[in-house]
């Protein structure tokens, strides 16, 4: 396997909290898939959850080499968790098309947060 994409993003959680306080769920509805939005609304720390998903999707778009808005939407990237709780990444629509153009077969993701920041790194591999 060869690495064909690498992306990292960091988000200030307080900035997300301020946006949510000012605009409600507008950002969450733009960034999160329906499944992620359901988790967000039930989460004990919704702004922290949103910040981590925002960082993860930005990192994924960077790993794809497009960024958000060049055929890849936040909605085309779903961040979930496996049965052990580790984050997983799934691509659909424009993100999946780009993944196929890269001849990539797998994406790896790491997400972390500490007090004020959320950070994510995505590695995309091809065979």
Swiss-Prot record:
**Keyword set, alphabetical order:** Cytoplasm, Fatty acid biosynthesis, Fatty acid metabolism, Lipid biosynthesis, Lipid metabolism, Magnesium, Metal-binding, Transferase
Binding site residues for Mg(2+): 9, 58
Where does it primarily localize?
cytoplasm
Record keywords: Lipid metabolism included? yes
Q: Which Pfam families match?
A: ACPS (PF01648)
GO BP terms, alphabetized: fatty acid biosynthetic process
Give the cofactors, semicolon-separated: Mg(2+)
Q: Which GO terms describe its molecular function?
A: holo-[acyl-carrier-protein] synthase activity; magnesium ion binding
EC number(s) recorded for this UniProt protein: 2.7.8.7
Q: Where in the cell is it found?
A: Cytoplasm
Q: Which InterPro entries has this protein been placed in?
A: 4-PPantetheinyl_Trfase_dom, 4-PPantetheinyl_Trfase_dom_sf, ACPS, Ppantetheine-prot_Trfase_dom
Q: Which reaction does it catalyse?
A: apo-[ACP] + CoA = holo-[ACP] + adenosine 3',5'-bisphosphate + H(+)
A GO-annotated cellular component: cytoplasm
Describe the family membership recorded for this protein in Swiss-Prot or TrEMBL.
Belongs to the P-Pant transferase superfamily. AcpS family.
Described by its record, this protein's role is as follows: Transfers the 4'-phosphopantetheine moiety from coenzyme A to a Ser of acyl-carrier-protein.
Per its UniProt record, what HAMAP family does this chain match?
A: AcpS (MF_00101)
Q: What protein name does the entry list?
A: Holo-[acyl-carrier-protein] synthase
What organism, scientifically named, is this protein from?
Shewanella baltica (strain OS185)
């Amino acid at each position: 396997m060869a690495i064909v994409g690498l992306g990292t993003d960091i988000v200030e959680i307080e900035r997300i909290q301020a946006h949510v306080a000012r605009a409600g769920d507008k950002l969450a509805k733009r960034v999160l898939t329906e499944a992620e939005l359901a988790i967000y609304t039930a989460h004990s720390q919704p702004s922290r959850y949103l910040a981590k998903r925002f960082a993860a999707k930005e990192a994924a778009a960077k790993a794809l080499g497009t960024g958000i808005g060049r055929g890849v939407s936040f909605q085309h990237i779903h961040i979930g968790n496996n049965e052990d709780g580790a984050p997983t990444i799934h691509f659909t629509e424009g993100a999946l098309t780009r993944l196929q153009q890269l001849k990539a077969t797998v994406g790896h993701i790491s997400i972390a947060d500490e007090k004020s920041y959320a950070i994510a790194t995505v590695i995309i591999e091809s065979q």
